[in-house]
Swiss-Prot record:
Belongs to the aconitase/IPM isomerase family. LeuC type 2 subfamily. This is Probable 3-isopropylmalate dehydratase large subunit. Pfam families: Aconitase. It comes from Methanothermobacter thermautotrophicus (strain ATCC 29096 / DSM 1053 / JCM 10044 / NBRC 100330 / Delta H). Heterodimer of LeuC and LeuD. Binds 1 [4Fe-4S] cluster per subunit.
Length: 419
């Protein structure tokens, strides 16, 4: 029987020859990730079910990124809980406050390879599907069961493949592609589906750009966002991981597969407008909207390629006096390479604030929140009310290039319009 890549991975993990969409399976977990914000509840739930030892400390990864450094006594206590837990359980894959955002650090450190089942107590765990894994977010109670047993049940999802074709125009990036797709599909248009990204345009993208697509699959309700592994994928994991991998491909006649054709050849930069991610418009329709803050970072667009795109625009230019620009590299490795390439110097000279690698204002709780009536333009993935501070603020989402150009202009701007 023909299957999709997601079905093949879940079949492998559950010890079956085949699975079908809608079937309930009990799958072995290859990687279990938690962080400083959701980890303590996972630990509490683990204790509550009477367990003393995790099933396999080598398959558990703990990363501090949400409240880094601790911004309150409660956050400091959460950090202490997790530090004690990793020491008690012998968890070696522990990344304290210095490393960066979990969805950048996890693949960077070689913890994800094709063919794996990856779970994390964060909704954007779907990011790691860009490496050909079945990756999805779970709750802290589910993670407690994973800690205890190394297994978790799944309902096998149907697959919606986005066949993306066409050459991207100047100033158009992966972020514009995924925003356009979400705008067309809707915030709940792919609920509990495996969103598969394919086609010639995706094949031309770097692994970092593919991560942008997978990262935002959850914003249309997707269970995961997955890209079939190719040589780019394997080159990425070869440099970072010594783990074995398995390459699975979708059979074109798989019964649960539906396909949506996406032509991006005429696409222009996109902006998600308040207060929903699927409220997407071309940048030209919102150009001139005044902004108070620009946030360049997050697990969506805080990678080196994003910093390069922004720095190319900011070089020999200044951030508008009316704008606060925050630059938050997604990881220490990204920060270090940006330093080596002179990108940090460009940001500082332009008048941006460069912060330590962390989630920043994305979760609305740390580093650079916005106040009532203020407008933020962000390269992150969500713009719900209160997402970056006050529920009376407005948050727009864009690519790094649009964010940088807008920081210079003081209002939402097409990068091509800067003189």
């Amino acid at each position: 029987m023909s299957m999709t890549v997601s079905e093949k991975i879940l079949a492998r993990a559950s010890g079956k020859d085949r699975v079908e969409a809608g079937e309930i399976v009990m799958a072995d977990i290859d990687v279990a990730m938690t962080h400083d914000l959701t980890g303590p509840l996972s630990v509490e739930s683990f204790r509550a079910i009477g367990e003393d030892r995790v099933w396999d400390p080598e398959k558990i990864v703990v990363i501090f990124d949400h409240q880094v450094p601790a911004d309150s006594i409660e956050a400091a206590q959460n950090h202490m809980i997790m530090r004690d837990f990793v020491e008690e359980q012998g968890i070696r894959n522990f990344y304290d406050v210095r490393e960066g955002v979990c969805h950048q650090v996890l693949p960077e450190k070689g913890h994800v390879v094709p063919g794996e089942v990856v779970v994390g107590t964060d909704s954007h765990t779907c990011t790691h599907g860009a490496l050909g894994a079945f990756a999805t977010g779970i709750g802290s109670t589910d993670m407690a069961m994973v800690f205890a047993t190394g297994k978790l049940w799944f309902r096998v999802p149907e697959t919606l493949r986005f066949d993306v074709r066409g050459k991207l125009r100047e100033h158009v990036y992966a972020k514009d592609v995924i925003l356009n797709i979400i705008g067309r599909v809707g915030a709940d248009g792919a609920t509990y589906m495996a969103c598969e990204f394919a086609g010639e345009t995706v094949a031309e993208m770097s692994v970092s750009d593919r991560m942008v697509l997978s990262n935002m699959a959850i914003e249309m309700g997707g269970k995961t966002g997955i890209v079939e592994p190719d040589e780019k994928t394997l080159n990425y994991v070869r440099r970072r991981s010594g783990k074995p991998w398995r390459v699975f491909k979708t059979d074109p006649d798989a019964p649960s597969l539906s396909v949506m054709e996406v032509d991006v050849s005429d696409l222009e930069p996109q902006v998600a407008c308040p207060h929903n991610v699927d409220n997407v418009k071309p940048v030209t329709e919102v150009e001139g909207t005044e902004i108070d803050q620009v946030f360049l970072g997050s697990c969506t667009n805080g990678r080196l390629s994003d910093l390069r795109d922004a720095a190319a625009i900011l070089k020999n230019r200044k951030v508008s006096d009316s704008v606060r620009m925050l630059v938050i590299p997604a990881s220490r490795e990204v920060y270090r390479r940006a330093l080596d390439e002179g990108l940090i110097e460009i940001f500082v000279d332009a008048g941006a604030l460069v912060c330590n690698p962390c989630c920043g204002p994305c979760l609305g709780g740390h580093v650079g929140l916005v106040g009532p009536g203020e407008v933020s333009l962000s390269t992150s993935n969500r713009n719900f009310r209160g997402r970056q501070g006050s529920p009376e603020a407005e948050v727009y989402l864009s690519s790094a290039a649009v964010a940088a150009a807008s920081a210079v202009k003081g209002s939402i701007t097409h990068p091509g319009s800067l003189k």
